């Protein structure tokens, strides 16, 4: 089944709203419209930047989309510091990242909470990018495939087959995030293929064939081509490289079959 690649730029806690506008303008200027027929491109800024990004995207009729880095499992109420999926939907958000390794590591999020957040995103018409990935000790022990399969199942628990068909999965080996170490294309394919096989068990073969599985972990313009060429890798969740508008545009073009012309 043909799956349109997705290049998603996770800005993490970087850039104020003025800087966000400048970066989106740079990406839009650097990536001609023709590429958007072959690749979906989204930026995922901090909450405080989303309204500014929305105004720019809508005003200039840009073809890229934008997302959020997290959401609450609650719709509203006395939950100080939380941001509801209902609020994000009103801002025109397309994607929302759930279960990023930094949320799991620094905020104690587990698979059950990730599954609840994925369900909350879907409830409000948002596409969750569900993140899973192993630490270095798990990989070195040779347990990385089973670990990710188990985490996938836990992070999608309670979702129907139809709902699973609406998610994006991001495989992000924790040992490769922000370290400059990159999983080889074969490493990425091994786990992403296992994820797809497990999706067939969780849902069905049609869902498994349609869900996009991304690689995340020090992806950049030099390595993204080989990674997305793998049969079961459908794009990248990009960290640091997404803060460079020209490089992010180049990565998007490569995923579309590039190069950037």
Swiss-Prot record:
Residues that coordinate or bind substrate: 10-12, 178, 218, 239-240
GO cellular component: cytosol
EC id: 5.3.1.1
Localization terms from the record: Cytoplasm
A GO term, aspect molecular function: triose-phosphate isomerase activity
Pathway(s) the chain acts in: Carbohydrate biosynthesis; gluconeogenesis; Carbohydrate degradation; glycolysis; D-glyceraldehyde 3-phosphate from glycerone phosphate: step 1/1
Reaction it catalyzes: D-glyceraldehyde 3-phosphate = dihydroxyacetone phosphate
Record-annotated active site: 100, 172
Main enzyme class: isomerase
Keyword annotations of the record: Cytoplasm, Gluconeogenesis, Glycolysis, Isomerase
Pfam families documented for this protein: TIM
Gene Ontology BP term (one): glycolytic process
Listed InterPro entries: Aldolase_TIM, TIM_sf, TrioseP_Isoase_bac/euk, Triosephosphate_isomerase, Triosephosphate_isomerase_AS
CDD domains tied to this protein: TIM
Known function: Involved in the gluconeogenesis. Catalyzes stereospecifically the conversion of dihydroxyacetone phosphate (DHAP) to D-glyceraldehyde-3-phosphate (G3P).
Assigned protein family: Belongs to the triosephosphate isomerase family.
Subunit structure: Homodimer.
Record-given protein name: Triosephosphate isomerase
Gene: tpiA
